[in-house]
């Protein structure tokens, strides 16, 4: 979007060869254009970087009597992913029109990305690329909502596809607090992994009954109908054929899945009775069934994981560096409602490592991604970030991270907004997430994404 605004100062109808100058770069700036006939301020507001024609192509207004308002119109000749050329045309009664050709050299977007055209909260954002589309999966009250978009940086309005059951004689395990759904295309079906519990029933006031469950699509269309496939076993005493219940499992949230060498695994955040949230793993016999006892991979022990005394590892996300043969579990640490929320990782050698052996996983020596602007309402900023997932640019050439950031340093759970940004890789095969993007900071569009 390019907007130009003009204000006249002692404007003389006898313009006398009044010149509108093209500058080399127009980027959130203003320009005073003047001569003996008066002056005109040209304000430029843009969400991109622009370049103009060189000085040799400056245009002048012929001497003539001008009157009335100056009209400005811009039209584009092309729409591409690398540049876009536009013509700015200035007209006024009695004055020959003036045209300026401007080339938009880089297309940009800003965070937080919009949802249905609006800036809105989206904690634990999950966006997955499948074919030409990006699918967004999010909690919507006590339901799961999904949408589809051709663009990573624009989330279309979501539609609720499934809701938690109500309380009844069977006392369902999953009637409240639907958290962090994740969407996967496995074989010819789609699956959603989510957490829920029974808070508010039977005298339960906390979140200790949170367990992980799975939904399966009835067709190969994630925007179609879904069916509940039940709770997943997240305990430490697995027996073949065991039926998962709240009694024989433990607190389990943020479950995700990956496959390595033909074996599928479930990874989640869980704890027992000591309130220490750990990253845990188990094997799966199919996308709806965990087939082993859980194994603990990570316990929060580092100072940067326990900054306010609470011990939390959660939000595991799978990231693979195929070229270097590395598989990462990128997780969040510290409380999600605080400005200390950040990312770290566990790394496995995909060639020689056993995902079920904690000794084969290497923890990052420090946190890997964080930002805190310490802004308080009404000043927007980035104050703690985490609970991520990963995807590719539309043309598949770039790696992108999706995460949420808190708007205010004391914003809590209610101020988490969706962010996306490109990341790269270090020479040793570990991810380089760089610095968290700022609130409203222009970033280049993902490669292959058009407006």
Where on the chain are the PLM-derived regions?
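Bacterial Sec-dependent N-terminal signal peptides
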Residues: 1-26, 99, 105-113
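Solvent-exposed, low-complexity, repeat-rich "mucin-like" stalks and linkers
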Residues: 13-16, 22-52
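Intrinsic-disorder/low-complexity, polar/charged segments enriched in Ser/Thr/Lys/Arg/Asp/Glu/Gln
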Residues: 37-41, 69-73, 97-99, 326
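Short beta-strand/loop motifs in extracellular/secreted proteins, especially
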Residues: 40, 48-52, 57, 86, ...
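Surface-exposed binding patches on compact interaction domains or structured appendages
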Residues: 45-73
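Short, surface-exposed loop/turn segments at beta-strand-coil junctions that are enriched for proline
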Residues: 77-81
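A short beta-strand micro-motif common to beta-rich folds, especially ectodomain repeats
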Residues: 82-94
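Carbohydrate-active catalytic/glycan-binding domains of CAZyme proteins
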Residues: 106-451
């Amino acid at each position: 979007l390019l907007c130009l605004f003009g204000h006249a100062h002692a404007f003389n109808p006898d313009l006398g060869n009044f010149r509108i100058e093209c500058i080399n770069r127009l980027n959130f700036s203003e320009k005073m254009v003047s001569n003996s006939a008066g002056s005109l301020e040209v304000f430029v507001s843009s969400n991109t970087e622009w370049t103009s024609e060189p000085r040799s192509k400056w245009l002048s207004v012929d001497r003539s009597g001008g009157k009335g308002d100056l009209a400005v119109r811009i039209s584009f000749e092309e729409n591409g992913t690398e540049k876009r050329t536009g013509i700015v045309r200035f007209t006024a009664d009695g004055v020959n029109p003036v045209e300026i050709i401007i080339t938009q050299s880089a297309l940009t977007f800003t965070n937080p990305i919009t949802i249905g055209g609006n800036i809105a909260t989206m904690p634990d954002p999950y966006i997955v690329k499948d074919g030409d589309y990006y699918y967004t999966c999010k909690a919507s009250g006590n339901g799961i909502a999904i949408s589809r978009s051709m663009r990573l940086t624009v989330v279309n309005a979501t539609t609720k596809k499934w809701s938690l059951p109500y309380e009844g004689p069977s006392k369902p395990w999953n009637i409240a607090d639907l958290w962090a759904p994740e969407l996967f295309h496995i074989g010819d079906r789609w699956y959603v992994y989510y957490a829920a519990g029974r808070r508010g029933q039977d005298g339960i006031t906390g979140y200790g009954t949170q367990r992980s469950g799975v939904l399966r699509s009835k067709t190969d269309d994630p925007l179609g109908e879904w069916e509940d496939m039940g709770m997943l076993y997240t305990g430490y005493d697995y027996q073949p054929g065991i039926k998962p219940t709240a009694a024989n499992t433990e607190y389990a949230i943020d479950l995700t899945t990956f496959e390595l060498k033909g074996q599928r695994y479930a990874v989640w955040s869980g704890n027992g009775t000591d309130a220490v949230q750990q990253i845990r793993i188990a094997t799966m016999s199919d996308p709806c069934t965990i087939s082993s006892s859980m194994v603990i991979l990570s316990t929060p022990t580092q100072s940067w994981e326990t900054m306010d005394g609470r011990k939390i590892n959660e939000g595991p996300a799978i990231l693979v560096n195929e070229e270097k043969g590395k598989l990462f579990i990128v997780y969040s640490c510290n409380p999600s409602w605080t400005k200390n929320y950040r990312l770290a990782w566990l790394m496995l050698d995909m060639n020689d490592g056993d995902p079920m052996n904690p000794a084969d996983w290497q923890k990052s020596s420090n946190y890997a991604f964080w930002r805190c602007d310490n802004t308080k309402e009404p000043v927007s900023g980035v104050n703690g970030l985490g609970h991520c997932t990963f995807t590719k640019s539309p043309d598949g050439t770039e790696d992108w991270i999706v995460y949420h950031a808190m708007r205010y340093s004391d914003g809590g759970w209610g101020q988490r907004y969706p962010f996306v940004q490109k990341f790269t890789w270090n020479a040793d095969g570990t991810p380089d997430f760089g610095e968290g993007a700022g609130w409203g900071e222009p970033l280049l569009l993902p490669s292959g994404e058009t407006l």
